[in-house]
Amino acid sequence: MAAERSLWVVGLCPGSRLGRVVRVLLLLLWFAARGGALYFHIGETEKKCFIEEIPDETMVIGNYRTQLYDKQREEYQPATPGLGMFVEVKDPEDKVILARQYGSEGRFTFTSHTPGEHQICLHSNSTKFSLFAGGMLRVHLDIQVGEHANDYAEIAAKDKLSELQLRVRQLVEQVEQIQKEQNYQRWREERFRQTSESTNQRVLWWSILQTLILVAIGVWQMRHLKSFFEAKKLV
């Protein structure tokens, strides 16, 4: 999850039927892999951040639980209830969209409004508990993006859906999420194109500037040499 998850489809003709089918299949495989669980270690005063690429208008749910290292037992034990976790989420424009204090185990939810890289940061409030300061925490984190964030068992019970109706709803939401992912990939391609054009333009202007500088230096050297020869009465 800390690493960027991206999909680039190359070597296919955009207008061909085979190309469209392969694109959809690859998107389905990539979409099925979205979300995942991991654990990491942090000091109780340390801050750990992750980058998650998220399309716009997409729900994200994160579940976490913390364990505190017991030096006597030399193993991780469930953290005390007083030890909380502060969660902060920033959008690609560095605006804070979630900043909240949770307990030692909890769940946070947010919806993206801008496509791009979202920063998810966690750190404990252990500075309030000098007894635990300097200890080591193990944080188990599970982040689900888009359709994977939905609890379909709860939805089926709440809306009284049959198995077929629930399956249809899942497929509809998967298609909607795939469309969001496709739009996001197109947005990334457009951004990359703009960056490439801007870079090429800067390289061109820099080359022109270098040429003008070389011409100016050459003219100055010629005039300087001419003045030198005239002063020496060599010409």
From Swiss-Prot:
Record-annotated membrane-spanning stretches: 202-222
Membrane topology: Single-pass type I membrane protein
Keyword Glycoprotein: yes
Motif placement: COPI vesicle coat-binding: 228-235
Signal sequence range: 1-37
Protein location: Endoplasmic reticulum membrane; Golgi apparatus, cis-Golgi network membrane; Endoplasmic reticulum-Golgi intermediate compartment membrane; Golgi apparatus, trans-Golgi network membrane
Glycosylation sites: 125
InterPro entries for the chain: Emp24-like, GOLD_dom
Molecular function GO labels: syntaxin binding
Region ranges (Required for interaction with STX17): 121-160
Membrane side Lumenal: residue ranges: 38-201
N6-acetyllysine: residues carrying this PTM: 160
PROSITE patterns assigned: GOLD
Keywords attached to this entry: Acetylation, Coiled coil, Endoplasmic reticulum, Glycoprotein, Golgi apparatus, Membrane, Protein transport, Signal, Transmembrane, Transmembrane helix, Transport
Pfam family, one: EMP24_GP25L
Motif (COPII vesicle coat-binding): 228-229
Maturation and modification: N-linked glycosylated containing high mannose.
Name of the protein this chain belongs to: Transmembrane emp24 domain-containing protein 9
Annotated source species: Bos taurus
